[in-house]
Amino acid sequence: MKLTVLGGGGVRSAFLAKSLAYNAHRIGLTEVVFLDNSADNLAIFGEIARYVFNTIRPDIQFSTTTDPVAALQDANYIITTLRVGGDESRIRDERIALEHNTLGQETTGAGGFAMAMRSIPAILRYCRLIEEHAAEDAILFNFTNPSGLVTEAIIKSGFKRRVYGICDALSELIRELPAILGCEERDLSVECYGLNHFSWFTHFTVRGEEVTERLIASPELYQKTAMQYFSPELVRLCDNQLLNEYLYYYYYRDEALKAIQGAGETRGEQIARINQEMREALRTVDARTQPEAAFTIWMQHYLRRENSYMQNESRQEKFHTREPLTLRQFIEEPDTGGYAGVALDILEAVNSTTTKRIVVSIQNHDTLDFLRPDDVIEISCDLSRDGLKPVTPVKVPTAQKNMIACVKEYERLAVAAILQQDKSLAVRALMAHPLIGSYSLAKTLVEAYLDDEQFAAWR
């Protein structure tokens, strides 16, 4: 079985290579290809990924390429992890929003729309190549942000293969909870519902016993997990439901905007600076012949990115920070799966006798009765050899229903605007978004984002 990664020259490629290598046996992988349109990125990050993969599974063919046809030829599984436009476009997205006193976070609000304007056309070009060259039963896993919007656009474009939206923002919180509850992760059951980067967690049970009240009453929840950005009072106001970390930009909008404006640089500018310093250091070594030296440089700079996550936005230090590892330690450390783990769980399930719960973005059908059947939602699913069974949440409070419905309307309009390259629909989309909600602001933002030659065909 052949698996292809679109965007395989990204900074996080080593993690993906490690996860695929350790889990290749679960889905019978015989070939892995990392594709990227940047030969420079493949020469650095692709080579580190190659070394990691080959050290773990030297018996499986691993290659990197800039040729999309060769990469996708007869591919059975495809994972997309693209960043179209790179750091420069991200900075532009953020700065345009901030100039108009609104949040420009890369997957949320105005910034998320601007990113989708670039991501969706690029993904759809690859989708056409997948239909032409990949295996007839190929399965696509989309991790390209904004993942929910991109996944919905893929489905509504008429793409004929199975597609799932995957995200690793949810698994981190779920992995942190067993330490607070004194249980194993396999014994904890959680329901998640909503939209990508806009979801809530509810109905926590350990071996069938309800533990929600005990969990939300624990001070450690707000000190030692991704819930550190939220107050216990807010959790109570949300009907005792935990929050996806991206909801910080909604429930703490004013504080987040003030913090970002006062930080002196946006997250995109911070990442670009770290990446530039990393590239300069990596130019002093050859990643193919000096993998340990290249890995050490990469790890040092990667952790600067990882450990500073949400610092500017929340004015908080991240509780769980990572310590640097040597290349050998990285390879030998147990794999936690990440977004590759979700994809592997789905693929393995058809041949398994066990049931496992994951969170994935799929079409709603009748899972959330206040949304349309063709809407893409983010939802807990029970996996078994019978397939994916969405878990209808026990309770969706009215406030959450209204918020989800509002953002979903934005997503519908945004996807339609991008598929049709329609400026008026784009304005309607941003008008509907709760972080914007203004005709004059929406029109100004759309005109600013469209002021680029790549959007010349928009009307």
Q: Which residue stretches match the model-derived regions?
A:
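Rossmann-fold NAD(P)-binding glycine/threonine-rich loop
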Residues: 84, 88-157
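Redox-cofactor binding/interface segments in oxidoreductases and associated redox assembly factors
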Residues: 73, 79-80, 142
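Short acidic low-complexity segments
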Residues: 61-74
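Long, compositionally biased stretches enriched for glycine and/or charged residues
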Residues: 182-459
